[in-house]
Regions:
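Interdomain linker/hinge connecting the two RecA-like lobes of the SF2 helicase core
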Residues: 1-60, 64-67, 71-78
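Residue-level signal for alpha-helix termini/capping positions
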Residues: 49-53, 112-113, 161
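Conserved helicase ATPase core of P-loop NTP-dependent helicases/translocases
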Residues: 61-63, 69-126
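Cofactor-binding loop segments of dinucleotide-utilizing enzymes, especially the Rossmann-like FAD-
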Residues: 65, 88, 142, 171-173
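Conserved strand-to-helix beginnings and helix N-cap segments that scaffold or border functional pockets
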Residues: 66, 73, 131, 150, ...
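A short beta-strand element within the Helicase C-terminal
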Residues: 118-122, 126-143, 148-151, 165-171
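Conserved segment of the helicase C-terminal RecA-like domain
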Residues: 155-190
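Long, largely alpha-helical accessory region at the distal end of helicase-like NTP-driven motors
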Residues: 180-218
Length: 218
């Protein structure tokens, strides 16, 4: 529906600046729908189940949007995973109850020592926080902004003496088939997401398998 409205807007001959504003809003709405798609939770549960079976649930960071955090918390709780959220709400002032650390520093320390198996992160890990012990990352809310996704990936692939490999799961949403014009617009809109997926895949040890999945995604 949004794609059809985008096509109609592109075909219209109204005021250019007004159309440009409407176009940007529609693109943003579409990006939010993709970022928070319900189908992502099924894939997320499958990944958690696999990691749980392999006993590889420590050192996990899950990057989410604000709309996803409660559902992700519910899934982790149902799997008896010890986690903590890390958002911009956690304090940065040192306090005695956090062993003379800030709340944020305390949470990160608990994660590093294994007291928290997973962190649910919103934005605050995009820059400025170093957690080299993190070895697994799930991108529930992926960004097409190169700076943002490079910073998120960087949180996971940072070298550490106790880390031989880093594992990234980028959960993406496929497009829905429509008429030819809709499909053409869909493909153009998804180009940025494809670039992120390819960049991650091409730098992975399992690049052949990862790129095959991207080809199927196309």
């Amino acid at each position: 529906k949004l794609t059809s409205r985008i096509i109609a807007l592109l075909s219209s001959k109204g005021n250019n600046s007004d159309n440009e504003y409407k176009f940007e809003r529609l693109i943003e709405q579409r990006a939010d729908i993709i970022k928070n798609a319900e189908n992502k939770y099924d894939v997320f549960e499958d990944i958690i189940g696999k990691l749980k079976q392999e006993k590889n649930l420590n050192n996990l960071i899950i990057f989410v949007s604000p709309q996803q955090i409660e559902k992700v918390k519910e899934i982790l709780a149902n799997n008896n995973i010890i986690f903590h959220k890390l958002t911009q709400e956690e304090g940065t002032r040192k306090e005695a109850k956090y062993c003379n650390k800030s709340e944020r520093e305390y949470i990160i320390q608990q994660f590093k020592t294994g007291n928290y198996q997973a962190l649910i992160a919103i934005k605050c890990l995009d820059e400025g926080i170093d957690i080299p012990s993190a070895s697994r990352g799930i991108l529930m809310a992926s960004s097409t902004n190169p700076r943002e996704y490079v910073q998120r990936i960087g949180r996971i692939i940072r070298q550490d003496t106790n880390k031989q490999f880093a594992y990234l799961y980028d959960i993406c949403v496929d497009s829905i088939d429509g008429d030819e014009e809709c499909n053409t617009i869909e493909k153009k809109i998804r180009n940025k997401e494809q670039l992120r997926m390819k960049e991650i895949a091409e730098n992975a040890i399992n690049s052949v398998d990862a790129l095959e999945h991207i080809i199927q995604f196309n």
